């Protein structure tokens, strides 16, 4: 971030009136923990609760945050405000206690909006690519010495955290469309990476309602704000005529994009490309340490934002080239060994068919000669049901497949939308022979039967499969150079 030998003056944000102690219900979540960390570093007394300990709760405790395991009414006794995520039920004992004592209960996004209120907010929305794009923007602004505050849905590897209080007026944050809570935010710059049918229970199954919600989000921009939009995406193109704010576009395929990538080449995990920019600005030759067309688009959004903010071209290129990635976003662990084979282990958070397809494509680009074996954990029964045929099609494109059962995220089971059903449908398609994982403790032995020497093993999904990847890494990985 900023030069430690010459630190900037810390940007002063007015305090929230009458608020001293802030309690988070579900503090271990990626979005909640980041906001809690920023508020703690702003000087507030922060507490929180979660159902289990984790690396996140341990980190918060090390920051002197009071973290309780289990939800109990007395946890909120000292709270002046209680922050909840959309996953927290109204009958949660801490929520009930706060309501009885007339303590304000606010959604996570409303607290993020309060943090953003007095800052120069940059919000990144979209079905896919939010975390990586937010991280890239934060890294480039940091490389330029602008020392932003950031709140990200994954761990920024270079910072070792998913949130950080910066010394400047800049705030970069993800904008969550899953529950439409991004409508609370009032940024100065809004990025829309793409729009796809996901979390459709929030939108009553109506794609038009989903698209209009993105329009409403962009109209939260002030008249001097700007929307940065990917015109390679069909739904994004459809809503552009409805937007009454300044718009900057980017893309690869659309020749009318303001920022356009050309001459894209891959070299292992590196991607190089040329960026055409509007207004007579010189082209940029860019290098990323990440494979995949989707990451080129994420970088284009970053370049558009940074250029509009007046960031020096060299700082843009340095920030992109030096970007060390985000936890669980095509995270290369190293070499995983079984008694008979050695495979490269990659872990990725993607859990939508488009995201899984992008990971497979990126892996093919980076390692074109290797077999791809995927260990996949579906996430949510509703998503599996709504996108069932897309999952069957995409998961049939790997060379070996192990399927875990659905990570429910609190949803009730839906007949015909589980891991076994997916396994049957993929087998009937006839392109790959899937193996259903009956018991997660059997994963290592199943992998020993499936993996061949030189394979690429990808652990994929948004549930607890990240813990499986870490377990495999600890048990059988020789660290990468």
Swiss-Prot record:
GO MF annotations in UniProt: ATP binding; UDP-N-acetylmuramate-L-alanine ligase activity
Keyword Cell division carried by entry: yes
SUPFAM superfamilies (alphabetical): MurCD N-terminal domain, MurD-like peptide ligases, catalytic domain, MurD-like peptide ligases, peptide-binding domain
InterPro entries listed in its UniProt record: Mur-like_cat_sf, Mur_ligase_C, Mur_ligase_C_dom_sf, Mur_ligase_cen, Mur_ligase_N, MurCDEF_pg_biosynth, UDP-N-AcMur_Ala_ligase_MurC
Enzyme class: ligase
Documented EC number(s): 6.3.2.8
This protein's UniProt keywords: ATP-binding, Cell cycle, Cell division, Cell shape, Cell wall biogenesis/degradation, Cytoplasm, Ligase, Nucleotide-binding, Peptidoglycan synthesis
Family listed: Belongs to the MurCDEF family.
Function, in words: Cell wall formation.
Entry protein name: UDP-N-acetylmuramate--L-alanine ligase
Lineage summary: Bacteria, Pseudomonadati, Pseudomonadota, Gammaproteobacteria, Pseudomonadales
This protein's encoding gene: murC
């Amino acid at each position: 971030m900023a030069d430690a030998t010459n630190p900037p003056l810390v940007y002063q944000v007015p305090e929230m009136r009458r608020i001293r102690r802030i309690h988070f219900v579900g503090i271990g979540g990626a979005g909640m923990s980041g906001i809690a960390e920023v508020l703690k570093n702003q000087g507030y007394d922060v507490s929180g609760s979660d159902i289990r300990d984790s690396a996140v709760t341990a980190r918060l405790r090390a920051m002197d945050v009071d973290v309780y395991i289990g939800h109990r009414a007395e946890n909120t006794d000292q709270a002046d405000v209680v922050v909840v995520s959309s996953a927290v039920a109204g009958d949660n004992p801490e929520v009930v206690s706060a309501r009885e004592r007339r303590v304000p209960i606010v959604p996570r996004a409303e607290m993020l909006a309060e943090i953003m209120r007095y800052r120069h907010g940059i919000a990144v929305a979209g079905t896919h690519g939010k975390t990586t794009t937010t991280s890239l923007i934060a890294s480039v602004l940091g490389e330029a010495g602008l020392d932003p505050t950031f709140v990200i849905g994954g761990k920024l590897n270079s910072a070792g955290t998913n949130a950080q209080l910066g010394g400047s007026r800049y705030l970069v944050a993800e904008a969550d469309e899953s529950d439409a809570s991004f409508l609370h935010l009032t940024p100065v710059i809004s990025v829309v990476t793409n729009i796809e049918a996901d979390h459709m229970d929030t939108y009553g199954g109506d794609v038009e309602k989903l698209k209009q919600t993105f329009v409403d989000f962009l109209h939260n921009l002030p008249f001097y704000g700007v929307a940065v939009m990917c015109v390679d995406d069909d739904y994004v193109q459809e809503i552009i005529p409805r937007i009454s704010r300044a718009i900057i576009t980017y893309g690869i395929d659309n020749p009318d994009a303001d920022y356009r990538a050309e001459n894209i080449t891959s070299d292992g995990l590196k991607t190089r490309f040329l960026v055409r920019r509007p207004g007579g600005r010189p082209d940029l030759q860019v290098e990323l340490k990440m494979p995949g067309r989707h990451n080129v688009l994420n970088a284009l959004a970053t370049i558009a934002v940074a250029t509009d903010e007046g960031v020096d071209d060299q700082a843009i290129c340095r920030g992109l080239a030096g970007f060390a990635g985000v936890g669980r976003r095509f995270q290369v662990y190293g070499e995983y060994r079984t008694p008979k084979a050695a495979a490269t282990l990659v872990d990725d958070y993607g859990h939508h068919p488009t995201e899984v397809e992008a990971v497979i494509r990126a892996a093919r680009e980076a390692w074109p000669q290797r077999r791809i074996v995927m260990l996949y954990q579906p996430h949510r029964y509703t998503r599996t049901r709504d996108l069932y045929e897309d999952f069957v099609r995409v998961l049939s494109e790997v060379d070996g497949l192990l399927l875990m059962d659905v990570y429910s995220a609190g949803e009730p089971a839906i007949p015909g939308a589980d891991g076994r059903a997916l396994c049957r449908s993929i087998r009937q398609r006839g392109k790959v022979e899937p193996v259903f994982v009956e018991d997660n403790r059997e994963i290592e032995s199943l992998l020993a039967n499936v993996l061949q020497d030189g394979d690429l093993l990808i652990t994929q999904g948004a549930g607890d499969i990240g813990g499986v990847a870490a377990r495999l890494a600890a048990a059988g990985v020789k660290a990468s150079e």
